[in-house]
Amino acid sequence: MDRYFFILTTIDLFVLGFMCLLTRLSESLNKKQKRGFLLAFTLIACISVLEVITIVVDGAPPGYRWLNILSNYLGFGLTPAVPLYLVYVLDKKSIIRRIFKAAVCCEGAYLLFLAATLPYGLVFSVSRENLYARGAYFYIYVAMYYAAMLYLMVATVRTAAAFQNRSRMLIYPLTLFLGAETVIQLALPELHVTWLCVTLLSVLYYIYCSEMWNQLDALTGLLNQNSYLNRTAEMRRSGGVLVVFDVDDFKQINDRYGHLQGDVCLAEIADCIKKAYARCGYCYRIGGDEFCVLLKDEESEARCAKTLQALLAERRKVFAILPTVSLGSAAFSGEDVVAVKDRADRALYCAKKEQKARAAAEKHGDDSERTA
């Protein structure tokens, strides 16, 4: 076996082992995320070892033919499963995750097809002299691999968009890099760099996902306060509008229905805010029952506010205890962020007073009708 390839495989396995330990010891990943990354890293390591075995036993005495066949079968069969394990770590609410079970079924069907065609050498063959060769339908393996990578790319971009992640476009060059490397490997099979590249990209994917999740508020899925503070520094230069939201009488919800129901209310309100504003700006939870949105311009402000109230009213038909939400806004005009926030807060408090006065007037009107 080529010493260069042996060194690459050793580096590959060391990196994967390190990533497994890092994943297991992580305090920021949940159980599902840990499981997905651990399975992906372990599977990549196993396939890397299988590739070493195929190279060692290829051309060896015919007694090793069974090992050559088995190693190639498992290597070609399990390769498309690597992107599936990486999709598994993504948020379960993502639309693209709904077809995950179908993708797993496709992988199972592919494994059965590969096993059934072994005697005919359609995808690959190992001669009686124990020599490996690609089959006439080797492209089926290539198609499965590219389809799995495409699925991972689309799933990640969709999830990143749902999480309002600004770096989601970085997924495209990563996918293109792996696709180009695969083409080179197909054209020059003696290089044996595929799994080193897959390992590199899986590590980058781990970093990308960790960064994406670290920007989120765990309860609501909106961007968190740290993201807000970093973004407002940019808004001071580029301009825009700060919209702040406060949940009316939220303490009463917690006191009357408990904190679990209060958390449900916050999650529902956050979802409505994101649906109303996400296309025009970035949505944040900056503490307790306080939310804010950084809009790119003032033109969409009124329309988004109207949409939010409509969404809340619709959601309140199902979840009756959902409280009202007051909002205030202020435009960035070059001054300090604190000053902009102060103006937005003053507008918010004025809106809350108007909301309370309106609610009191409606209650008084209802009481008058009952008395009459």
Locate predicted features.
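Extracellular-loop-to-transmembrane junctions of the mid-late helices
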Residues: 3-11, 116-151, 185-191
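Hydrophobic alpha-helical transmembrane segments of multi-pass membrane proteins
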Residues: 8-62, 68-85, 103-121, 170-186
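Alpha-helical transmembrane segments in multipass membrane proteins, preferentially the mid-helix core
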Residues: 19-23, 85-88, 142-163
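Membrane-interface helix-boundary motifs at transmembrane edges
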Residues: 24-37, 88-100, 157-167
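Signal-transducing coiled-coil linker helices
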Residues: 155-157, 161-219, 226-240
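Conserved long alpha-helical elements within nucleotide-processing catalytic cores of c-di-GMP signaling
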Residues: 224-241, 251-278, 284-288, 292-293, ...
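Short catalytic/binding micro-motifs of nucleotide second-messenger systems
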Residues: 275-280, 304-322, 350
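Catalytic-core segments of nucleotide cyclases and related cyclic-nucleotide turnover enzymes
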Residues: 309-312, 326, 330-372
